[in-house]
Amino acid sequence: KRRLKNLILNVVKNPFNMIVLISLIILFCLIIIPLLTMIATTFTAGQAELRRIGDGAQVGDFTLYYWQYMLASNMSKAVLWEPLRNSLIIGVFVVIISVPLGSVLAWLMVRTDIPGKKILSMLVIIPYMIPSWTKALSWLAVFRNSTSGANGFLAGLGLPIPDWLAYGPIAIILCMSMHYYAFSYIMVSGSLRSINSELEEMGEIQGASKPQILRYITLPLILPSILSAVIMTISKSIGTYGVAA
């Protein structure tokens, strides 16, 4: 008991521990409890669905109706599986475009002496500061065709703009890629700056070519940052509604 008492006193006396404890309590009250409550309601019958559930169901009875309706009903394909498939496809292609683009830009800014590097390093971040839906509006202003009414800039010049370029997955993927490449740029550039340059110099002294140094020394060291950028990019692109709308 005395050890437990001393442990509690040590935790309470440490301001950092108290901040963590208070944060966990707030997290539990504002997020965990409402989330569990919301999940629990999906297993209880509601007044509006009693007729559909049938079998003499009463309000509050246990039911799997909502999960069956979402996962295995006639509406599941239209309201769940197709949107989920499209979101995953878009997320994967956004990663394929934006992560290599941001990583290459990071390497150019950190490992090369291109002119105007300081200004370019600031300009590279600006697209992420602008909301993604504004890029979608800019895309429409340039590529919109007569299908939606008013012509965009290129259609106004008399150029035929196909629907697949003006709207749809390709337009969404490109707009999101122009927005989310900043994730990989920021993460990879920070990782490159933290790498001890002596490791690359030693590889060069041993006769390794630049591609070999990049492949066997630099890339393994920045791989965690690239994987973090992949996770951030695909999660954000899947959850972004403004561009698609």
Regions found by a protein language model. Give the residues of each.
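Glycine/proline-centered hinge or cleavage motifs at structural transition points of membrane proteins
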Residues: 206-207, 220
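Helix-turn-helix DNA-binding elements, focusing on the entry/boundary residues of the two helices
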Residues: 199
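Transmembrane alpha-helical segments of polytopic membrane transport and secretion proteins
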Residues: 1-23, 211
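Membrane-water interface segments at the C-terminal ends of transmembrane alpha-helices
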Residues: 15-52, 66-193, 219-245
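Short coil/turn motifs that cap or connect alpha-helices
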Residues: 115, 208-209
